[in-house]
């Protein structure tokens, strides 16, 4: 029978519930269990697809095209599984589904209420995740903080699941904070006690408490927490700030967290073999070289907006024993006059995805700098579109060339809507989303990176390269090295007379893993290191 683990958070948000859930998932997977994981977000948006990155951070896209929470990126990178649309559920999705059922008459004229209709829908999403993946263990992270009004239906639903399927099949893990008061020179357990009290008042008794802390937690403090929160002392797990995220699973294993979980859920599996993971962490902690990459974006104040890009750069660096330092460059501040000052000290330039016109001209200036100065360049999504526009303007001499997204009246729409997108008015869920094939041309940087004729990558965009400009750009050394299998859609572009200048319409960062870097990132970082060494 499938087992269910629920991870909740208390005291404050951003405690690392997602990393805790992902780390536990890795440990259980390494015990030979089939693990899946999901995130429940209490906000009323149907998905984060139309939310500002300043509000939410990155939108992570799954193979099947779901626009999801950035925590799913952590889950995929840690557990090394590909998640699906069932892995991220929002209040908006739940209510939308219930209201559609009500309109279809599925409730037989009954009064539709939070209990049982909303809670039943939530429970069904939990069970469905296990069914669809045939999982031994389903880990579900409940977003938000215990005490938030938005989380109440989710907490009630997970309380009911224990009654439905029995205590041996359900486990509750509560993540809290033990703050350190500098003036008093001591740590305080009271916020954790109150958070657990709040959770218990809702009918949920946590089986494990994971305490986030800056300082070591003494045995006396663990005993105190165990007493007040009614759990075993060994089930108080310390989650101290780590020098690398990938060290967290090892820290949890040292404290026997996965064994406590298996004992409670009556899972008789051998201990997790973390030899490879330990070697990875040792490598990460002892990188001997450095390279600096300029990330030219418009959301640089909130680095979570580019979290998968940064992780993919790091993963690529690990292959070369290199610590990749990201220099954050606000695209709105980049001009032809200061671009040398802003990116001149870096070994490679990356322009990530984005929407809208803010910061576009600064990105184009940075791309021109990379092209003219032979600096390794990687463009992603909008970065690929702007690389095409920069080339059209400055090499073909097409003054005013642009994307019809940015300037609908441009005389040269290098980037334009697909014909089937022209009449679409809704913004949510109407992009080209998810995994699509890309056919590569031999003897190109893209082919050399992948070493395969056809690759599959995840997309999130609406606008495409306008094929009427292809012949003229090819004549000038612009290479279309990756296309859709029918050749209609441009997927990857690069430059002939440049050490390494590649840009992709898809989002390669989404499939990178710490032990298996994404090929374009791998070769981009390699080219950046070569550039540094040649200076």
Swiss-Prot record:
InterPro entries given in the database record: Class_I_gatase-like (IPR029062), CTP_synthase (IPR004468), CTP_synthase_N (IPR017456), GATASE (IPR017926), GATase1_CTP_Synthase (IPR033828), P-loop_NTPase (IPR027417)
GO molecular function annotation: ATP binding; CTP synthase activity; glutaminase activity; identical protein binding; metal ion binding
Free-text activity regulation comment from the record: Allosterically activated by GTP, when glutamine is the substrate; GTP has no effect on the reaction when ammonia is the substrate. The allosteric effector GTP functions by stabilizing the protein conformation that binds the tetrahedral intermediate(s) formed during glutamine hydrolysis. Inhibited by the product CTP, via allosteric rather than competitive inhibition.
Gene Ontology CC terms: cytosol
Domain Glutamine amidotransferase type-1 per the UniProt entry, residue ranges: 292-534
Gene Ontology terms describing biological process: 'de novo' CTP biosynthetic process; pyrimidine nucleobase biosynthetic process
One Pfam family linked to the record: GATase
Annotated metabolic or biological route of this protein: Pyrimidine metabolism; CTP biosynthesis via de novo pathway; CTP from UDP: step 2/2
Binding sites annotated in the UniProt record for UTP: 13, 188-193, 224
Binding site for CTP: 13, 148-150, 188-193, 224
Binding site for ATP: 14-19, 71, 240-242
Binding site for L-glutamine: 54, 354, 382-385, 405, 462
PANTHER family found in the cross-reference section: CTP SYNTHASE, CTP SYNTHASE-RELATED
Name of the protein described by the UniProt record: CTP synthase
Source organism (scientific name): Bacillus cereus (strain 03BB102)
Taxonomic placement: Bacteria, Bacillati, Bacillota, Bacilli, Bacillales
């Amino acid at each position: 029978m499938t087992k269910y683990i629920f991870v909740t958070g208390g005291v404050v948000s951003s405690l690392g519930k997602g990393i805790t859930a992902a780390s536990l998932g890795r440990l259980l997977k390494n015990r030979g269990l089939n693990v899946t994981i999901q995130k429940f977000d209490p906000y009323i948006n149907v998905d984060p697809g139309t939310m500002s990155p300043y509000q939410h951070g990155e939108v992570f896209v799954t193979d099947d095209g779901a626009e999801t929470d950035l925590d799913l990126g952590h889950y995929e990178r840690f557990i090394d599984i590909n998640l699906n649309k069932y892995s991220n559920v929002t209040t908006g999705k739940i209510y939308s589904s219930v209201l559609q059922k009500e309109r279809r008459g599925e409730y037989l004229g009954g009064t539709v209420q939070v209990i049982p209709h909303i809670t039943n829908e939530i429970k069904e999403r939990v069970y469905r995740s296990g069914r669809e993946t045939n999982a031994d263990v389903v880990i579900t992270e409940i977003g938000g903080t215990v005490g938030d009004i938005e989380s109440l239906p989710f907490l009630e639903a997970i309380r009911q699941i224990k009654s439905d399927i029995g205590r041996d099949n359900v486990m509750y893990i509560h993540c809290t904070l033990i703050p350190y008061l500098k003036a008093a020179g001591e740590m305080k357990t009271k916020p954790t006690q109150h958070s657990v009290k709040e959770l218990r008042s809702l009918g949920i008794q946590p089986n494990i408490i994971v305490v986030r802390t800056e300082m070591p937690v003494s045995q006396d403090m663990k005993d105190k927490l165990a007493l007040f929160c009614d759990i075993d002392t060994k089930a108080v797990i310390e989650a101290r700030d780590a020098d690398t995220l990938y060290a967290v699973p090892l820290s949890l294993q040292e404290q026997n967290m996965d064994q406590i979980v298996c004992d409670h859920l009556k899972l008789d599996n051998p201990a997790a073999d973390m030899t490879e993971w330990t070697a990875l962490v040792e490598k990460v902690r002892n990188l001997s070289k450095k390279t600096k990459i300029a990330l030219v974006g418009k959301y640089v104040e909130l680095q979570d907006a580019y979290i998968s890009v940064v992780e993919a750069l790091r993963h690529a660096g690990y292959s070369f024993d290199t610590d990749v330092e990201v220099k954050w460059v606000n695209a709105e501040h980049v001009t032809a006059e200061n671009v040398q000052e802003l990116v001149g000290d870096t070994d490679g330039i990356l322009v990530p995805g984005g929407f809208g016109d803010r910061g576009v001209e600064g990105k184009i200036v940075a791309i021109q700098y990379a092209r003219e100065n032979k600096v390794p360049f990687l463009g992603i999504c909008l970065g690929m579109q702007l690389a095409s526009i920069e080339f059209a303007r400055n090499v073909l001499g097409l003054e005013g060339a642009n994307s019809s997204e940015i300037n609908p009246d441009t005389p040269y729409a290098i980037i334009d809507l697909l014909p089937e997108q022209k009449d679409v008015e809704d913004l949510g869920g109407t992009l080209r989303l998810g995994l699509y094939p890309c056919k590569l041309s031999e003897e190109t940087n893209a082919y050399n990176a992948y070493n395969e004729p056809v690759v599959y990558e995840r997309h999130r965009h609406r606008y495409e390269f306008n094929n009427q400009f292809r012949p003229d750009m090819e004549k000038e050394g612009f290479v279309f090295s990756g296309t859709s299998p029918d050749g209609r859609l441009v997927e990857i572009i690069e430059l002939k007379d440049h050490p390494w200048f590649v840009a992709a319409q898809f989002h390669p960062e989404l499939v990178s893993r710490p032990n298996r870097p994404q090929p374009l990132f791998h070769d981009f970082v390699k080219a950046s290191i070569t550039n540094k060494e040649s200076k």
